[in-house]
Amino acid sequence: MIEQGTESAIYNVGSENSLFIAVPNSVAYVASKHAVFGLSESLRNDLPDFIHIGTIFPGYVDTPLTGQIEGGMNANEFAEIVKEQIKNKEHIILSHAYNTVHIEKRNHEIALAYEKYAPRYEGDDEYDVGAILSKLQNDKVWRF
């Protein structure tokens, strides 16, 4: 893809479990879905801009895989929602609106932990790994 130099895309399929734990007692599944998001974000950071990288985060969708368990989003409805976002070259592809409740809760918990144990201060970028690596690269000490 890089050698061709033409616009292309990679969309990895994660899950709502990439963002929060929706399915209890599923350690391996949840860990693998978090890894999918990390993979996509790393590729997005490392590859040229003409290669669009995204992650699709489906919630519960009725498919043959779900068998007799009802209550998921209709697969055609899901496809329409996802298709529009891919056409727009979005990198975070979402479908299930209520998941914002879970995301906001998780982000709030993280923000509270930072406020309590690692509050912002003047010059707090001194330990930012991105800034540190950029300086090392500029000083020709580190190459990535």
Regions of interest found by a model, annotated:
Residues 2, 6, 11-35, 41, ...:
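Catalytic loop of short-chain dehydrogenase/reductase
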Residues 55, 63, 67-108, 133-136:
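C-terminal helical subdomain
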Residues 113-144:
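Non-catalytic terminal and boundary segments that flank Rossmann-like NAD(P)-dependent oxidoreductase
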Residues 32, 40, 61-66:
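Ser/Thr-centric signal marking residues that sit
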Residues 5, 48, 87:
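Short conserved AdoMet
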Residues 37, 47-61:
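Conserved Rossmann-fold SDR core element
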